[in-house]
Amino acid sequence: MRALYFRTTTLSTFFILCSLASNDIPRTGGNKIVQPPKPNILKQGCPSDLLHSRALRSIQLACRSHPATVISAFEGIQEGLQNCANRLRFQQWDCSEAGNIMHDPPLLRQGFRESSLIWALSSASAAWGVATACAQGWIDDCACNNHMGQNEYEFGGCTHGVQHGITASRKLLTKVGAVNSLLRKVEKHNLKAGRLAIKKTLISSCKCHGVSGSCQQKTCWKRTATLEHITDYLVEKYARAKLYTDDSVVKTTDLIYLEASPDVCKVKSVAGRVCAWRNETHTQGDCDRLCCGNGFSIRHEVVRVKCDCEFVWCCNLVCKDCIQHRWISTCNGTPPKSLIF
């Protein structure tokens, strides 16, 4: 698992550094669009855990025919889960142990409110990952045209990559066969809500054309929002998720769930979780609440961190090394009580 995390971090960092740059304004050399090099993991094919995945037959098939698409989707999901863990870091349930949908985690065999978020976030993140890879020119099926034509204003961005990402997410993550149970129905609904989140958060990008930068003509296209923004959008939906019954009337963009969630303190170990011991307002990050009454420990750390970072076009982030003193408070606790959360 440690090696898998390293692989994920490598590609996800590249996503962050280059995705907005390629989606906004194409880098050109003469009349040719200059694309960043394809990461090595997209050239190596699917790893064995995806190639032999038992969770989704579609993953196995796509790994053989379109491995770069599967890997881009997987990495997008991993990035989405990391964003979710950061966004919910002050909540008792924080996404950190939810598991990737492509590995069939226990949480997605239940109909909890938390399950609805992971379904939707996985669907949206997979679409985002593929759309970003398309915009970079890393996936042959949807890469932007290599040539812009005689006039630069003819270039209309990479809008088709967004739809390709949404379609790929649907094909990869939606289970085939009849929807014959409430859980499958809820799963399918939340996956669709995640794909719709991509459309709801699209950003318009425009480029002016004319003498000396005047806007005599303008080319506009749609691009995906940052994954952080998409995650925030879905977390807000999660906070307003609706309990679903046979006669429920819900919007396609709503997140829905089937049953009340268990008490996190009774099913999930909090041992080692970082909390804010100096927080006297007893709100975000409060140790008493996050540690479920198990108490906490405080230790001093001297850590080396990156600082004074500069973005060097394209796509390198150059930073200095700095020393930082930290007081870290972590929850005491017992071993994990459940594999669900």
UniProtKB/Swiss-Prot annotation:
GO biological process annotation, one example: programmed cell death involved in cell development
Paired cysteines (S-S): C84-C95, C134-C142, C144-C158, C206-C220, C208-C215, C265-C292, C275-C287, C291-C331, C307-C322, C309-C319, C314-C315
Superkingdom of the source species: Eukaryota
Lipid attachment site numbers (O-palmitoleoyl serine): S212
InterPro entries: Wnt, Wnt_C, Wnt_CS
PTM entry text: Palmitoleoylation is required for efficient binding to frizzled receptors. Depalmitoleoylation leads to Wnt signaling pathway inhibition.
Name recorded for this polypeptide: Abnormal cell lineage protein 44
Any matching Pfam family: wnt
GO cellular component annotations of the record: extracellular space
Keywords recorded for this protein, A-Z: Developmental protein, Disulfide bond, Extracellular matrix, Glycoprotein, Lipoprotein, Secreted, Signal, Wnt signaling pathway
Glycosylated sites: N279
Cellular compartment(s): Secreted, Extracellular space, Extracellular matrix
Homology family: Belongs to the Wnt family.
Signal sequence coordinates: 1-21
GO MF annotation, one: cytokine activity
Role according to the record: Ligand for members of the frizzled family of seven transmembrane receptors. Affects male tail development, vulval precursor cell specification and egg laying. Involved in morphogenesis by influencing polarity of asymmetric cell divisions of the B, U, and F cells in the male, and the T cell in males and hermaphrodites. Controls spindle orientation in B-gamma cell division during male copulatory spicule development. Involved in specification of the P7.p lineage during vulval development.
